[in-house]
């Protein structure tokens, strides 16, 4: 419904805003994207540069996109509002990217914005730069004691060899099983080699673990 040049797009957005991803997915995605990744918020005003977009597409596809050149004279920049944000990951890798849907801000648009005061579950996480021993075929992934205590489920230290199975979910929704045991140092052994082989991890890659309040464990790479 339109009134006085004010448009409420709540109903249209209900099918556009990506609510299929969990809060843990969002947090892991941001950790994998890294601290330099800055994403606008839902409802924010941004500028869209048509010519710059075309040039980026040409550079990524290595093809000239003359058919995309507009027949009319577009301004160098268009003021828009962010109406949808989708945090995604490449199918054949763990490279993160974001799809942002914009609406030209030609009217005063009422768009649902993020509630900064809403409850946010606590998520503990840690990152580690992989070493040669972490990525070797005979190696294991050693977790610093501080990170293991903060981010991993507690071990039963009354056992002769405290150990447990961890199930962690990556950004693709795949489950990975690791054996977490207390030794010197603590290590994730069984299942780790399968993970490093599948992800093609090398020295210098960064692994990310995140655990929510409910105990849900997530794993990713940067």
From Swiss-Prot:
Gene: ARF23
Pfam family for this entry, one: B3
Alphabetized GO MF terms: DNA binding; DNA-binding transcription factor activity
Lineage: Eukaryota, Viridiplantae, Streptophyta, Embryophyta, Tracheophyta
SMART domains to which the protein is assigned, alphabetical: B3
Subunit details: Homo and heterodimers.
InterPro entries linked to this entry: ARF_plant, B3_DNA-bd, DNA-bd_pseudobarrel_sf
Binding region for DNA: 126-222
Family: Belongs to the ARF family.
Protein name (Swiss-Prot/TrEMBL): Putative auxin response factor 23
């Amino acid at each position: 419904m339109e009134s006085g040049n004010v448009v409420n797009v709540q109903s249209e957005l209900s099918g556009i805003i990506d609510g299929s991803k969990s809060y843990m997915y969002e947090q892991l995605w941001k950790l994998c994207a890294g601290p330099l990744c800055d994403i606008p918020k839902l409802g924010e005003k941004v500028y869209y540069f048509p010519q710059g977009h075309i040039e980026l597409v040409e550079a990524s596809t290595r093809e000239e996109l003359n058919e995309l050149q507009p027949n009319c004279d577009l301004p160098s920049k268009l003021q828009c509002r962010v109406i949808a944000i989708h945090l995604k990951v490449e199918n054949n890798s763990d490279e993160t990217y974001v799809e942002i849907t914009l609406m030209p801000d030609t009217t005063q648009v009422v768009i649902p914005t993020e509630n900064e005061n809403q409850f946010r579950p606590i998520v503990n996480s840690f990152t580690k730069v992989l070493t040669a021993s972490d990525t070797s075929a005979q190696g294991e992934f050693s977790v610093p004691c501080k990170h293991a205590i903060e981010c991993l489920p507690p071990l039963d230290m009354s056992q002769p060899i405290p150990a447990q199975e961890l199930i962690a979910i990556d950004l693709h929704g795949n489950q990975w099983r690791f054996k977490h045991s207390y030794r010197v140092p603590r290590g994730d052994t069984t299942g780790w080699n399968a993970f490093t082989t599948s992800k093609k991890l090398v020295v210098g890659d960064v692994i990310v673990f995140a655990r929510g309040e409910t105990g849900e464990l997530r794993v990713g790479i940067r």
